[in-house]
Curated annotation (Swiss-Prot):
Primary location: other
Span of domain BLUF: 56-149, 473-565
Species of the source: Euglena gracilis
Protein name: Photoactivated adenylate cyclase subunit beta-like protein 1224-5/1F
Region feature (Disordered): 426-445, 835-859
Biased composition (Polar residues): 846-859
One GO location term (cellular component): motile cilium
InterPro entries in alphabetical order: A/G_cyclase (IPR001054), Acylphosphatase-like_dom_sf (IPR036046), Adenylyl/Guanylyl_Cyclase_3/4 (IPR050697), BLUF_domain (IPR007024), Nucleotide_cyclase (IPR029787)
Compartments reported by the entry: Cell projection, Cilium, Flagellum
Biological process, per Gene Ontology: cyclic nucleotide biosynthetic process
GO MF term (any one): FAD binding
Family, per entry: Belongs to the adenylyl cyclase class-4/guanylyl cyclase family.
SUPFAM superfamilies registered for this protein in UniProt: Acylphosphatase/BLUF domain-like, Nucleotide cyclase
A Pfam family assignment: BLUF
Length: 859
């Protein structure tokens, strides 16, 4: 390791090679500097032997003080007195830094000690919400002896930009951390690149627990008002029982909890599912008249098999369980049909149970489920049949709220004042803007920088963009990485001169902090100008732009002029580990924004997530999945399953975000999203783009034996009222978009039957299309009786399911060395309607009298 020292020892930077140090010195225009070669000498154990083989690890964690008002120098001094003695005894080195309510600690020790040390002090009553930011190997000692002296931020630096950025990043991580499941936190908060993580094969027990007939609650106004409270109760009950029994939550969606357990905890999994049902029964008996919690019933399905926990997607990523998760969901649906609270599949599950529990179970017969060519055998615990859906439907019909008032009432979105309405979709561009030739700049090619776009919009809007917008004083903090490292003084000077002039015209003050290529910026100004800054925030000179904090401000804190500060002078000289802390916090913030929906990040930035108001609004729902996914992946390797899911989810996310939509969930191979209610045309455009991508992918691999040559999809679109609410309070929270999701999933499944890739409900979506699309772009589907819908016309949008299934069989046959079975060409389906001109008044158009059958839930 090589250390570059300049400015009389005030600046220090480490490099792996001598060439890297020389390149940095030349690019930064450093004149007087010295380079030292440092070799890490092995420690000597107590017995005199060498401990060179003992790898060191660095543990970095962030906590909240239980009593922030008591977090003063005296409080930290008492902690320092005890901690210094203990850490000297075990040879731990590191430091602690605190600011008001947040404490950040770094410890360097051997492989075994940090984990045991973390487990030892994590129950500390003076701290809460322990968040690991780093727990990985380190090549050598980076810090001296344990030090907690003068560790308050005010003692480290008085620069307002550094104080603000560090504090806001700590608050953002502490808030968004609770939206991640346990497995996600382990990887993401260490700042690892999500796209570089390979899938993790495993054998687990997976359960689907869902609220029975939850969709009917959303169709009754008196019950819709209590939807947020019902979901919060359900989330808390699942978290308590699943994590308390050694399992982990895989995903929450509308009224459904997906969880997983190790194979040696099958008994605990069954016990936890039964306990959830018993807890809901106890809650029902304790509710006051008019409470919707009295209508909560659960049913579950359990399945054991191969799978993997993997990262799918890169633009907006998520963890997903594959590939038997689809079968588990259908087993849960079968439990409702068989009128049993718990049903599990696979003889392997029966073998994993203990002798006592194995004697209690009984077979429930062989049943055909969707996605399986052969019937599957299921098991259940003996007991009286209970038609939960019928019992619940009777209770719903007789339900009267009376004088009961829930704690989290749902409010109509349109009824809120404009300044109180939460953002529904993220309109921030995710890619780099293309360079363009702008008139007025001499017709020459310009780099379309952030400040140039800002001044261009300001000129188009008039003398001042704030004259017609919200002038509320607002603060914005975001971080980004420089595309060119290191940033020379010449580049920083050019950035400073242009930005100062542009921001002065918009009454924006603030500071841009540069820490060796890491930018942290704090802005203060009128809300309309700050929001515009946020919407066009990315240019070719910076990447990984992440919003850290955005909230109203009482008065300006930053200096009157916009300044650029390089954190290579006094700040880092006062406290050298500051750069390391800032870099690690930035990595964690960037990873969190990748996995947490953008709208959730905006809602929680500067707000207490417990105070988020549940709202109800109309949106266009989108649901899509890979066709014949079960048969495609049964004989494919897990790496191939991950590859096609990663490709499909990336394409779907890109299409949705490009058209102004918001992705809700990625569940296995299924993706759900929504668009604003007045943006049905964009939803159709996103669906067309996704289907076109799948068709082109198949054409690209038509002559190759590859699973990507069999990827197809259908897309369902439906308009419905949804409830957006913050749910959960026991360590794991979820910002849900609850609607009649079963209906849009039904439309997605119906595309396979009617032969059209895109299905839209009538009149929900069709009435929101443009007149030209209604008259020329949609085709009736007479086979869709239970749920009237239309297909999007076009020869390129026809879905030939039989051809795709034959391709999957041919793929598996070619891989196994068998000759593919040649089947005679099947006749065209009688219900196929060729694309054509269908007007509003055609007989295929459904009347409003058919709406009575749309409430049927198909899961």
């Amino acid at each position: 390791m090589y250390i570059l020292v300049w400015k009389k020892g005030q600046q220090i930077k480490t490099f792996h090679t001598l060439d890297e140090a020389a390149q940095f010195k030349a690019a930064s225009n450093i004149d007087e500097a010295q380079v030292f070669s440092v070799t890490d000498a092995p420690d000597i154990s107590a017995s005199g032997g060498s401990n060179e083989a003992r790898n060191r690890r660095r543990l970095m964690y962030l906590t909240n003080s239980t009593n922030p008002e008591e977090c003063n120098p005296q409080f930290v001094g008492e902690m320092a007195r005890v901690a210094t003695i203990q850490n000297r005894e075990i040879g731990a080195r590191g430091f602690l830094m605190y600011s008001c309510r947040f404490l950040l600690q770094v410890i360097e020790e051997t492989v075994e000690d940090p984990d045991s040390l973390f487990a030892k002090f994590s129950p500390e009553p003076r701290h809460e919400r322990w968040i690991e930011l780093d727990n990985g190997p380190c090549t050598g000692r980076m810090y001296g002896d344990w030090n907690m002296k003068d560790s308050h931020l005010d003692s480290i630096t008085t620069h307002p930009a550094m104080l603000t950025i560090l504090f806001q990043m700590a608050r953002s991580i502490s808030c968004l951390w609770s939206y991640l499941q346990k497995s996600e936190r382990i990887m993401l908060l260490f700042g690892k690149d999500p796209g570089a993580q390979r899938p993790e094969p495993m054998r687990v027990v997976v359960t689907f627990t869902y609220l029975v007939d939850f969709g009917s609650m959303l169709s009754i106004p008196n019950l819709t008002e209590q939807a947020a409270e019902v979901l919060t109760t359900f989330v808390d009950g699942c978290v308590k029982n699943v994590e308390g029994s050694g399992g982990s939550i895989a995903k929450f969606t509308t009224g459904i909890c997906m969880a997983q357990w190790p194979i040696n905890r099958t008994v605990e999994a069954l016990t936890a599912i039964q306990q959830i049902s018993e807890d809901l029964a106890q809650l029902r008996s304790q509710q006051a008249p008019g409470s919707a919690v009295s209508l909560m019933y659960s049913q579950a399905g359990l399945h054991y098999g191969r799978g993997m926990l993997c990262n799918a997607g890169s633009r907006k990523s998520d963890f997903t369980l594959l590939d038997f998760i689809n079968t588990t969901s259908r087993i849960a649906t079968l439990a409702n049909k068989l009128k049993t609270p718990l049903l599990f599949h696979s003889f392997d599950v029966r073998c994993l149970l203990g002798d006592e529990m194995r004697e209690e179970i009984e077979g429930a017969g062989m049943h055909q489920v969707k996605g399986r060519d052969k019937p599957v055998g299921v098991y259940q615990f003996p007991g009286p049949e209970l038609d939960v859906e019928m019992v619940l439907r009777q209770k719903v019909e007789q339900f009267t709220p009376g004088r009961f008032r829930c704690q989290m009432p749902v409010v109509e979105y349109e009824a809120l004042p404009i300044w109180q309405r939460p953002p529904i979709v993220d309109d921030t561009p995710k890619g780099y803007p293309r360079p363009r030739t702008m008139p007025g700049y001499g017709g020459r090619q310009r780099s379309d920088s952030l400040v140039d776009r800002l001044i261009m919009i300001a000129k188009l809007a008039g003398p001042s963009v704030s004259a017609t917008g919200d002038t509320t004083l607002t603060t914005l903090t975001y971080i980004s990485q420089a595309t060119r490292k290191p940033m020379s003084r010449l580049h920083l000077s050019a950035l400073m001169g242009t930005a100062t002039r542009r921001n002065a015209q918009q009454s924006i003050t603030g500071t841009l902090l540069d820490v060796n290529g890491l930018f942290g910026q704090t802005l203060e100004g009128p809300k309309v100008a700050v929001v515009m800054y946020l919407s066009i925030r990315q240019d070719a000179r910076q990447t990984d732009v992440t919003t850290v904090h955005m909230a109203p401000l009482q008065e300006r804190v930053c200096p009157s002029e916009w300044t650029l500060t390089s954190a290579t002078e006094e700040m880092l000289a006062t406290f050298p580990p500051l750069q390391d802390v800032l870099s690690q916090l930035a990595k964690s913030c960037t990873s969190l924004e990748t996995y947490v929906r953008s709208t959730v990040g905006y809602l929680t930035a500067g707000n207490n997530r417990r105070n988020l108001m549940p709202v109800s609004c109309g949106v266009v729902m989108l649901a899509t999945d890979i066709g014949s996914f079960t048969s495609l992946t049964e004989e494919s390797s897990l790496t191939e399953v991950w590859m096609i899911c990663n490709t499909f989810i990336d394409a779907c996310t890109s299409a949705v975000c490009q058209e102004g939509g918001e992705v809700i969930k990625r569940i296995g191979d299924c993706v759900t999203a929504y668009f604003p209610g007045n943006n049905a045309e964009s939803a159709v455009a996103a669906a067309q783009e996704l289907f076109t991508f799948c068709r082109q992918l198949r054409e690209a691999f038509v002559d190759v034996v590859d699973v990507r040559g069999c990827v197809s999809c259908g897309v369902g679109l439906d308009y419905s009222q949804v409830v957006m609410a913050q749910c959960g309070s026991l360590g794991l929270t979820e910002y849900v978009v609850a609607g009649v999701s079963a209906r849009v999933m039904e439309v997605d499944a119906m595309t396979r039957e009617v032969g059209y890739a895109i299905g839209v409900t009538e009149p929900y979506v069709t009435d929101r299309l443009s007149p030209q699309s209604r008259d020329h772009g949609i085709v009736p589907t007479p086979q869709a009786i239970e749920l009237p819908c239309y297909g999007i016309a076009g020869e390129q949008l026809e879905l030939d399911v039989d051809s795709i299934k034959r391709g999957i069989k041919a793929l598996h046959a070619a891989r196994s060395g068998e000759m593919p079975v040649t089947e005679p060409e099947e006749a065209l389906r009688l219900f196929r309607v060729s694309p054509g001109r269908v007007r509003h008044g055609d007989t295929g158009r459904r009347s409003n009298s058919a709406q009575g059958k749309r409430s049927i839930q198909v899961r």
